[in-house]
């Protein structure tokens, strides 16, 4: 099988399969980051663009892929698999899909390694780039956040499809024939996304402390652990990866027609955190023109994982000034955090810093005069921006939605004019001396209401504060009613004597 291949073709084929496997892992994991990835195309690709695709490698993913491969290549009976799963904030997990790169024994002896295999692998990688966006896991990855995260796991060996449960679907992304076998890239994804908590099936702790499943072998004990696609816990250890990974080797083979250009790493090289940099110094974005490092004129400081400050090289590959002046966009796939450092930023006047920290007592104030439209009562305020908290105060937009609630707006101290109603209110309150004048009645006319309201709160309080005297307490009325009762007493007695028999009969009946 291998006798027909020359040593150079065999070396090129192994190299193509190796970097295709590494690039496939990058494409799958980056498709589950939850963010859209925008890559700027270039008319002059360099030798580091494998398979004619400018895929920005994540060093952590490349490290995990190489650790899973351990120097092996996908061959007959040996498959490289990438498992994508979902984990909730409560600890429940669910496998979503499994991507598998395997090889069978069907060979194509007449195919040319240098041209045909390389081009077909490039087409297969582009197909993978499209298929990763149409499976159900892609929609879930776009909605990940505090409730759940998407995890990935890379392992080498037999395909494990038990976690997908019943009803999973399998799709073949594509195949590429080689002189040593046929590479096949497939995907098995879960169709039943109804989540069922696995915590209800967990064993409860025995009373006697006996481990029930002590002699039960765990399934796949040698497989690697799950890793978050775009989430890193604070307790995880930050690993330092080299600036230029092995996957960024110049693609120079026996069929290369152009000389290898100077390799320029556009990836994030992880540097140790700057000592003395507080959280307030890492909370503002980095501008391209002001984020140039003093040590290297072609490096820009960009946010790294765990508040690290990686250096992004902006040196052009061919020395073109147009390539150097292009705006660099740092992909969230390469950056775990969302904060960036303003330590290396230039001052608004244009003077560049050399790493020394500016003293906090040197505050530069930038004054803006906001334009006020017609029919505005208050004068135009002068807005003062302190450059101690904002590194680039000149770039702060001059228009604000709400000036009253803006903490950075400083209005000049002007005496406030009181309205006549307010002056009358204060004068009435200050001149009040009797208990009846403690409450000042202000005419209140609510919108969409009648002017002749029968009663309001003030009228109600006034009436019950000074209630009228009870009629029963009046002496004249009491004397008059008693005289009337005495005058009518003989008539009542005569009526009682007249009806004496009826009253006696009523008493006897009781």
Swiss-Prot record:
For the keyword Cytoplasm, the answer is yes
Could you confirm whether the keyword Cytoplasm appears in this record? yes
**Chain ranges passing through the membrane:** none
Q: Which UniProt keywords apply?
A: Autophagy, Cytoplasm
Stretch list, region Disordered:
295-363, 413-432
- List the cysteine pairs that form cystine: none
User: GO terms for CC?
Assistant: Atg1/ULK1 kinase complex; cytosol; phagophore assembly site
**Where is composition skewed (Polar residues) in this entry?**
354-363
**Location(s) in or outside the cell:** Cytoplasm, Cytosol; Preautophagosomal structure
Q: What spans are recorded as compositionally biased (Low complexity)? A: 338-353
**Principal place of residence:** cytoplasm
Function in brief? Autophagy factor required for autophagosome formation. Target of the TOR kinase signaling pathway that regulates autophagy through the control of the phosphorylation status of ATG13 and ULK1, and the regulation of the ATG13-ULK1-RB1CC1 complex.
Q: Which PANTHER family match?
A: AUTOPHAGY-RELATED PROTEIN 13, PTHR13430
The similarity annotation says:
Belongs to the ATG13 family. Metazoan subfamily.
Q: What is this protein called?
A: Autophagy-related protein 13
**Organism encoding this protein:** Xenopus tropicalis
